[in-house]
Amino acid sequence: MQRRTKIVATIGPATEDPKVMDKLIETGVDVVRLNFSHDKHEVHIKRAETARERAQAHGRTIGVLVDLQGPKIRVGKFKQGKIHLNEGDKFIIDADHPLDQGTQERVGTTYKTLPQDVSRGATLLLDDGRIALWVEQVEGTEVIGRVVVGGELSDNKGINRQGGGLSAAALTDKDRADIKVAAAIKADYLAISFPRSAADVNEARELFRAAGGLGGIVAKIERAEAVENIEEIIRASDVVMIARGDLAVEIGDAAVPPIQKRIIRLARAMNKIAITATQMLESMIENSVPTRAEVSDVANAVLDGTDAVMLSAETAKGKHPVAAVAAMDRVCRVAEQEYEATHSRHREDQTFRRVDEAIAMATMYTANHLPVRAIAALTESGATALWMSRISSSVPIYALTSHVETRRKVTLYRGVYPVAFEITSSDHAEINRSAIDELRRLGTVRDGDMVIITKGDLTGVLGGTNAMKVAMVGNLPEFPESAK
């Protein structure tokens, strides 16, 4: 059985070689992530080209996700490269201090408005929360703190404020330039780092569209303010990514698991996509097998209903990138066999405003109550397939479309598989036969299998799906005994 949960893999030095990319695609990567926090534009352009070329060579469609860096809120560099802070030490972050002249007592910062964002009593977390600094006072450009959790601090480590409250804009000048590159490479998804509200998401979408970008917008949930505004952010986005690293620093690591479950639940209820990310198989950067805790983490994300799970450093710079993808694939497949992963009561008690949405829900209800082998969703935009994918089921959904952008988009939808399909006839019976023939060619159905076909009366019309047909492969005259 095909895996329903999608795998997003970050491409970096460990995986940019075409031969390694071949192995990633063969092992099951659905979407490649390009992290614009690192490397030059031409490097990312080449990686996107390679991913698409190798996917095509394997007869597959792969999505490309561009991840913007967002605001850099970091300490500067130290003269000696690093220092060690002990509990009780006085330490100053000075917005006017030279960025490359950090000492044991003082360091500069890339975030020049830090003194305006904090006051006495605030807690600053450095290096993903490994070091905690209690703010005693703010004097001019100096944030004067006392170390409450010590440790080693090296160049360019991040700064977070416990509970949120740093006012840095979600989109920087670098991000605006990167958005134009993302549009030029026809990114299927654009991820915004550190959005605080729907306004940040809308601004990114406007800039992306103005640059010619057609892909979906991913809101990375990694600020405390984003959690407070989560419903409006989900509504404004196409996808939400639960970026658990910075999020855990701001709200506390113990708060992340219930927030993760809530975000996934809300995203599915709003017919949006959810990606679970950060440290999913972190140990595999060095080791060839995951820890038991990592296996449980991936499996629980699948059982929560996440559409996709993401690998970051594991595939970007890890020693075992292909093994990491294989491990994630294996864990997802086993988790998907559990009852809660294939059954759903999503929206059973709600009414619908659109015919195509009602058809999608009716299709999944029928598929889950008859021995249906596959669903062929003839689609222009992929909307019908998206709505279907919100219903937990073991029945695969094939999005048949002539639009390459739609095929790439659905690579992130749980349980949906893209298929290139051209409608060459206006006769509905002929279209149905062609759709079934395509499923037969893929090896997913054979004579005697039951399938569901959804389509519209008018081809080429967005939102035009208004028909659902239950059909038998091979045109058998009646249902099999098990379906009666």
What are these regions (language model features)?
Residues 1-484:
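Non-catalytic helical/linker scaffolds that mediate oligomerization, partner binding
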